[in-house]
């Protein structure tokens, strides 16, 4: 688990100003056991900073995502953004079509990102491949149909 000093150093290394909301948001994303949505992050941040506004959390998430300190995930058709601290590695996500649960899926190919190779790059310098697998989670698979 990272400490407040670690989060402050992460912000400085990314040339971001160290603020209490940014440190609290980093802590909330890193402390989450799974990809956290914005409401979960806001609740977590408010445990330490009860006066923090929704906008301060959204602004912090935007800055942290732009600086590649957190990763934003928003599967197609989802209105909810989720954030994770697992960045810069070869992993993707699987999403349950029924309940929306999301889990990490490691790439089968080891090495640096991207783990997939495009058949044509059209002159782009590709540095990431985003794959979302869709299916039904174990809980929904055994749930009785309505």
UniProtKB/Swiss-Prot annotation:
Belongs to the Fur family. One of its GO terms (molecular function) is DNA-binding transcription factor activity. One of its GO terms (biological process) is negative regulation of DNA-templated transcription. Zn(2+) binds at residues 96, 99. It comes from the Bacteria. InterPro entries: FUR, Fur_C, WH-like_DNA-bd_sf, WH_DNA-bd_sf. PANTHER family: TRANSCRIPTIONAL REGULATOR FURA, ZINC UPTAKE REGULATION PROTEIN. Acts as a global negative controlling element, employing Fe(2+) as a cofactor to bind the operator of the repressed genes. Keywords: Cytoplasm, DNA-binding, Iron, Metal-binding, Repressor, Transcription, Transcription regulation, Zinc. One of its GO terms (cellular component) is cytoplasm. This is Ferric uptake regulation protein 2. It is found in: Cytoplasm.
């Amino acid at each position: 688990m990272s400490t407040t000093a670690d989060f402050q150093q992460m912000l400085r290394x990314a040339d971001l100003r160290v603020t209490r909301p940014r440190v609290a948001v980093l802590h909330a994303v890193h402390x989450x056991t799974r990809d956290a949505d914005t409401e979960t992050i806001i609740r977590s941040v408010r445990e330490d900073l009860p006066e923090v506004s929704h906008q301060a959390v959204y602004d912090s998430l935007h800055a942290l995502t732009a600086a590649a300190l957190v990763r934003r995930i928003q599967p197609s058709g989802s209105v909810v953004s989720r954030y994770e601290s697992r960045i810069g590695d070869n992993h993707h996500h699987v999403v349950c079509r029924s309940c929306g649960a999301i889990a990490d899926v490691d790439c089968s190919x080891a090495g640096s990102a991207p783990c997939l190779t495009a058949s044509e790059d059209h002159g782009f310098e590709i540095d990431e491949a985003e794959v979302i697998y869709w299916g039904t989670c174990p809980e929904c698979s055994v749930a009785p149909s309505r």
